[in-house]
Regions:
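Intrinsically disordered, low-complexity Ser/Thr/Gly-rich stretches
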Residues: 1-171
């Protein structure tokens, strides 16, 4: 285990993303002041060449076109622990039982629901929301310990999505 220093303040996206196994989705700029407050759910359709995969999801607020951002919240899930408790799960908050290991068959496509911790943030016009997906926590681990090719599906019957609670503006 090596010590890590985490810089305070606003980070630059280009510096953060150099040489990292990351899939990034960036929204168009917000057109008006927008508040996001509450629980966030990420539904993904995934497959892997291996029997399992880890998914780390982070949300960032992208402040400007120069890539300045800061992290809002995060969540993670080992896909073999995707089993949900139907009684405790809600539309906005999945609850995983962690009582059964559901390994993936090679290239089997399965849905997962990942809880991203609640947050509250106001976005100004021009700012963007960024979803970052990776196979490990890139903030703390240099190497990839989860090898193999993983796939995320985004269309048709396997449409993945991010469910975000937007608070209506006060009139």
């Amino acid at each position: 285990q090596q010590d890590r220093e985490i810089d305070a303040g606003v980070h630059t996206w280009a510096r953060k993303m150099a040489h990292q196994p990351v899939l990034t989705y960036i929204t168009p700029p917000f057109e008006e002041t927008t508040e996001i407050t509450g629980h966030i759910k990420l539904k993904l359709w995934v497959s892997s060449e291996t029997g399992d995969m880890d998914v780390f999801a982070k949300l960032h607020k992208l402040i400007d076109d120069e890539g300045r951002f800061f992290q809002l919240t995060e969540g993670s899930l080992k896909v073999s622990h995707r089993k949900l408790d139907d009684d405790l799960s809600t539309d906005y908050r999945p609850f995983h039982t962690h009582d059964a290991e559901q390994k993936l068959a090679k290239d089997e496509i399965v849905p997962i629901e990942l809880e991203i911790w609640p947050t509250s943030m106001v976005f100004q016009p021009g700012e963007r929301l960024v979803l970052e997906l990776s196979p490990h926590n890139i903030q703390f681990y240099d190497g990839v310990y989860n090898s193999g090719t993983h796939h995320i599906y985004t269309g048709g019957e396997t449409a993945s999505y991010l469910q975000v609670p937007i608070i209506p503006a006060k009139k």
